[in-house]
């Protein structure tokens, strides 16, 4: 598996961990994380920001990478993340022309239910992730969110018609 997880102090690739021994090695690891334009230059490329428990990080990433490769043999799924908090950034490139966003969403978001994950780690839910919110929140949690929204914003002035 070509799995690259980059955290603030660790890089995991092909299931091996590398701990930087100097400031220059630490910067080199962060360069991988910050200079991802080469990945997004393959179009289409779909970016995701998910989280799940750290204990499920490897299993979830392996599943999504495998599912992407089965769906698109010419495709790739690159995974970067924060090892210490379970946050992953996935870059899915089907390797063929066309609009495969909804198929890619399904491959990334559906397994989150099994791995007790969230469709968003750092960047909020937003309109695009709204259809998938049920994969990471129970009906009870969604009802509580709606209730809080109604209590705090009874006139729906804050982001009207958006997520909740």
Spans of features found by a protein language model:
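Single conserved hydrophobic/aromatic residue that forms the stacking wall/gate
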Residues: 1-7, 11
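Conserved glycine-rich FAD pyrophosphate-binding loop
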Residues: 9-164
């Amino acid at each position: 598996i070509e799995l690259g997880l980059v955290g603030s102090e660790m890089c995991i690739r092909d299931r091996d961990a590398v701990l930087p021994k100097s400031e220059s090695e630490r910067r080199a690891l962060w360069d991988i994380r910050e200079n991802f334009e080469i990945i997004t230059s393959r179009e289409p490329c779909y970016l995701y920001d998910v989280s799940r428990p750290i204990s499920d990080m490897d299993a979830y990433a392996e599943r999504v990478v495998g599912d992407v490769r089965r769906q698109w043999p010419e495709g790739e799924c690159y995974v970067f993340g924060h090892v210490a908090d379970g946050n992953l950034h996935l870059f899915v490139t089907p390797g063929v022309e066309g609009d495969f966003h909804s198929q890619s969403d399904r491959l990334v978001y559906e397994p989150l239910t099994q791995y007790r994950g969230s469709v968003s780690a750092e960047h909020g839910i937003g309109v695009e992730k709204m259809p998938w919110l049920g994969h990471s929140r129970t009906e009870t949690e969604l009802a509580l969110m709606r209730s809080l929204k109604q209590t705090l914003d009874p006139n729906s002035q804050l982001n009207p018609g958006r997520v909740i």
